[in-house]
Design a protein with these regions (language model features):
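Extracellular/surface-exposed low-complexity repeats and stalk/linker segments enriched in Gly/Pro
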Residues: 1-27, 45-54
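Right-handed parallel beta-helix/beta-solenoid
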Residues: 13, 54-85, 102, 120-123
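Short hydrophobic/aromatic-rich beta-strand motifs
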Residues: 21-38, 61-64, 96-98
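Right-handed parallel beta-helix
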Residues: 144-226
Length: 272
């Protein structure tokens, strides 16, 4: 006979059941924390108490392939389906956690100030653009994008990551791109246009950014913008790193394989 369906309750903050408190098929509800528990039994592994869903954590949003953009995004069980929907409700200080899967996004995605977008793993989280004639991400000061693979094809000169040309902001903390892979053909992996930002540096920072964007550009720095580049690895690009009109960059521990040009510089800025 099946175990009856039961719910045990506690109103003590932070209290959860132990294995001995539950039978298989029983649920335990903490009414203070709004958290639900049950038993999981796996042959050869054992029996343990697991939390179902989980309570919302302030300033953390979730995206997964089972989500819905009508959801709140505040828990994995109530996740958004797209990065754009999560970014659309993010505020300063928000972290967006993206689960494994392929996400086709209505770009550009305009990321507010001081927001982090972090994937489960760059090998398992892929983001592709719907619109070949639009940049993928427009970033703001203090943003971080990490553990994502960008894939697809865009028009020549379109950027994966760039400053927002529609909202020029003072850069007091550089956007940071780390542990990402760019496979978007023809794209500019990182576009630092100093005309689209204000401040003493007008800068972006990147670490461990691998680029296989055939016929594209790895990092473009122009109009007295600045980039700090660490561990940039490019393959089959037209130009790995290009500085124009007074753009400057520091490049450390990086490599350009195949392609046409490793380093390109032309033009001068207004400042000497």
């Amino acid at each position: 006979m099946a175990t009856p369906f039961r719910i045990k309750r506690s109103a003590v903050p932070g209290k959860g059941p132990s294995v001995s408190d539950l039978q298989l098929g029983e649920l335990a509800l903490n009414t203070y924390d709004a958290e639900l528990y049950t038993l999981r039994s796996r042959p050869g592994i054992g029996t343990e108490v697991v939390k179902i869903g989980g309570a919302a954590i302030e300033n953390v949003l979730y995206v997964n392939k089972d989500g819905n953009d009508g959801n709140s995004g505040s828990t994995p069980a109530d996740a958004k389906a797209t990065l754009k929907a999560a970014v659309g409700i993010a505020s300063e200080g928000t972290a967006i956690k993206v689960a494994a899967g392929t996400y086709i996004e209505n770009n550009p995605i305009k990321v507010p100030k001081q927001v982090s977008i972090v994937g489960d793993s760059l090998r398992e989280v892929t983001v592709s653009p719907q619109n070949a004639d639009e940049d993928m991400f427009h970033v703001s000061p203090g943003d971080m994008i990490s553990e994502l693979t960008f894939s697809g094809t865009v028009d020549k000169g379109i950027a994966v990551i760039a400053f927002d040309p529609d909202k020029i902001q003072y850069v007091n903390q550089s956007p940071y791109i780390r542990f990402c892979t760019n496979r978007v053909a023809n794209s500019i992996g990182l576009k630092v246009d100093g005309n689209k930002a204000v401040g003493p540096f007008k800068s972006m920072v990147t670490d461990s950014y691998t680029q296989y964007n055939v016929s594209g550009i790895g990092v473009s720095v122009s109009n007295e913008g600045y980039a700090q580049i660490v561990s940039l690895f490019t393959m089959n690009l037209d130009e790995a790193v290009a500085c124009h009109s007074g753009g400057q960059c520091d490049v450390t521990n990086s490599n350009s394989s195949f392609g046409n040009y490793g380093l390109v510089a032309d033009g001068v800025g207004a400042l000497q």
